[in-house]
Curated annotation (Swiss-Prot):
Cellular localisation: Membrane
UniProt membrane topology term: Single-pass membrane protein
Residue positions, PTM Phosphothreonine: 6
Subunit structure: Interacts with host ITCH; this interaction probably mediates ITCH degradation. Interacts probably with NEDD4.
Keyword Membrane: yes
Protein name: U24 protein
Native organism: Human herpesvirus 6B (strain Z29) (HHV-6 variant B)
Function: Down-regulates the TCR/CD3E complex and the transferrin receptor TFRC in host T-cells by blocking them from recycling back to the cell surface.
Length: 88
């Protein structure tokens, strides 16, 4: 005798699972009414928060470094341009 089949998961259930496991951000789609009230899984909460902080810090450092490098590069180009113009 066949066991009763479980229905396939709905779109919202799949999306909730993806959000819980961090594969999708809760703001990926406009239909997030069911995601907003979803707490992060309790077991790995502190580690997850720590990782998020580390990732944000890392992104901040990278972006700051890129901004400084861009400013230095522009200053260098202006300096070279001025030196070349003075020689003529």
């Amino acid at each position: 005798m066949d066991r009763p089949r479980t229905p396939p998961p709905s779109y919202s259930e799949v999306l909730m699972m993806d959000v819980m496991y961090g594969q999708v951000s809760p703001h990926a789609s406009n239909d997030t009414s069911f995601v907003e009230c979803l707490p992060p899984p309790q077991s790995s909460r502190s580690a997850w928060n720590l990782w998020n902080k580390r990732r944000k810090t890392f992104a901040f450092l990278v972006l700051t470094g890129l901004a400084i490098a861009m400013i230095l590069f522009i200053a260098f180009v202006i300096y070279v341009f001025n030196v070349n113009r003075r020689k003529k």
